[in-house]
Amino acid sequence: MFKKTVPLLSAVAIAISFSAGTGVANAQENASYEVNSPEPKSNDFWWPNKLNLEPLRQHSPESDPYGDDFDYAEAFSQLDLEQVKKDIEELMTSDQDWWPADYGHYGPFFIRMAWHGAGTYRVQDGRGGAAGAQQRFEPLNSWPDNVSLDKARRLLWPVKQKYGRDISWADLMVLTGNVALESMGFETFGFAGGREDAWEPDIVYWGPEKEWLKGDERYSGDRELENPLAAVQMGLIYVNPEGPNGKPDPLLAAKDIRDTFGRMAMNDEETVALIAGGHTFGKAHGAHKPEECLGAEPAAAGVEEQGLGWKNKCGKGNAEDTITSGLEGAWSVNPTAWTTQYLDNLFGFEWEQTKSPAGAIQWIPVDGQASNLVPDAHVEGKRHAPIMFTTDLSLKEDPEYRKIAKRFHEDPKEFELAFAKAWFKLTHRDMGPKQSYLGDMAPQEDLLWQDPIPAVDFELINENDVEQLKVAILDSGLSVPQLVRTAWASASSFRGTDMRGGANGARIALEPQMNWEANNPAELKKVLDTLKGVQEDFNDELSGDKYVSLADVIVLGGAAAIEKAGKDAGYDVTVPFEPGRTDASQEMTDVNSFSFLEPKADAFRNYYAEGNRVSPAQHMVDKADQLTLTVPEMTVLVGGLRSLDANYNDSDHGVFTDQPGTLNNDFFVNLLSMDNEWKKSSDNEAIYEGFDRKTGEQKYTATTVDLIFGSNSELRAVAEVYAMSDADEKFVNDFVQAWTKVMQLDRFDLK
């Protein structure tokens, strides 16, 4: 039973409020006060260098109010998506007094909501993106770049409330962006559901700065942006629209655009399409100076604001007095229709600097041209000049962007299709292969960025076939460590952040994965050649349409090796295996895009590349987080893989056993034994040497990620479980379960 303790001072305060009667209670309800009850200091306060294991505990099932039994895919399948779209479309022009729509249409507002939800995605580590609807939580709900989007989500609440659990906030926000575009005359490329909601904020490194929109701490050298970041400042989605650090230079801004959009996996054509397409709609808001008018962001606002922020005390507080970015104006004459007016204006006028009423640098046509071209969003009869940001002019001034923008201007159909495809990519980039898509509105064609995998068009092998194939693999001459290493290298490329990688597709046999240093290319080639031979021979013996893919053979090889290793250690082990993987081709694989999945470290193989800025232990936690592992799963996998002798390049660091290649718990037993003492190596400060405490004889070598399981108090507590005298069966079962989980992370067809 869960017991929530109450701090002593809080308990006293509660007792006083009850005994004082309703007068005190009413006073409390009407008062504005800060909660000053004492807060416990975290261990990080005292020991800031302590290894943080919290990423492995985030998004616990206990946080989900729907519980383990809820099947979102099943719930989503009950939706009448066309009716949902009709309800959303009706919302577009249902003006609300508390937040009036610009030009009588909420479409541009909802496009910004969807864009800023999806646009946090970064290709370097797959974090960010639309999945989870993280825009509802801190820090994203309070970023300066997301001012007013709290109102967009509140406008959408009646639709969410109506359809309940059948559509997640994450899916609804993206679908609403699509409907917004369609309601203004644009033909979208499609929509797929499948984004489940999160119930707490992601633990994400958004940058080193401690203030919003300040500093260049994330840059070094010749404006080199720190990895894995994909925005120029803390609190921005991409770039500063006024130019780098507010400097209104379109060419310098183009460099920032190319870098940040590239880190979101967009090429130049997609970047131009997104900027030009997105700025066809709506307007920027900077009617007054934010510092003089806006209240606290949602995370800092009072409880009476009910999750809303940036309360505006100037003028009406909304409509023509709205403040978001501080820039003010519209790009197009008709901001609620799909047109080429953005490009018409970009190339049709020369532009001069001006400032918005809020003091932000922006651009208008020179010499007062077109000063009455654009209607006001709220005041009838009032008109304005069109505007451009510094970053808009980058599309005109940068030579490569200009070529693309001119081409789009001359061919509106090409522009429309390019924007449709780029928008679909923007809003679906973090969902992985099409196998994870829900609904029937997604495009049928395979897109390279989706990491396509062929459909199963053959009969799967049965249990008898599996047993025969395991024998053939074990008789091939490959060792247990080789088979385990190869299966792990294939499956552990998976990233739970954007559902990319994994064993399905056998991309470990393709560029670039086959030449990743962590995969030991020389050994990998020999193993793959042997497994391909086994696969071909086996398929030749099969009858009918029965077939086994290389991807399945690789995973089954790991399973067979673990079963043998368990048997050699005295355990009867069965590793679950589900056939059904297929093999991708090199043509289906974007080499540049897949290069971002290359591990810079893999503690499970005791691999750590040179030039790393992050510690081995931190890399270990990050890798485990990407594999969606818990602390116990990470622990048992590291210990088991050490005993299986599965280290990178046959290293013996952490192999604390006299029987390498067998499945045993010796790693934990010997690591925690007081018979051994550890010292840093005099030859290599990254290596530790283990000595017999009595004889002084050196017995083992280890790395940080080996010894951390004995030095970190939390990891040691888990390691002790697997070192106990009664731990044999639990260790084996837990290892097999965790191993199988990793092997099946990308099997969306099984979920």
UniProtKB/Swiss-Prot annotation:
Its EC number is 1.11.1.21. GO terms for molecular function: catalase activity; heme binding; metal ion binding. There is a cross-link at W115-Y238 (Tryptophyl-tyrosyl-methioninium (Trp-Tyr) (with M-264)). InterPro entries: Catalase_peroxidase, Haem_peroxidase, Haem_peroxidase_sf, Peroxidases_AS, Peroxidases_heam-ligand_BS. The record marks R112 as: Transition state stabilizer. GO terms for biological process: cellular response to hydrogen peroxide; hydrogen peroxide catabolic process. Pfam families: peroxidase (PF00141). Coiled coil: none annotated. Its cofactor is heme b. Heme b binds at H279. Formation of the three residue Trp-Tyr-Met cross-link is important for the catalase, but not the peroxidase activity of the enzyme. The active site is at H116. Belongs to the peroxidase family. Peroxidase/catalase subfamily. HAMAP family: Catal_peroxid (MF_01961). Bifunctional enzyme with both catalase and broad-spectrum peroxidase activity. This is Catalase-peroxidase 2. The lineage of its organism: Bacteria, Pseudomonadati, Pseudomonadota, Gammaproteobacteria, Alteromonadales.
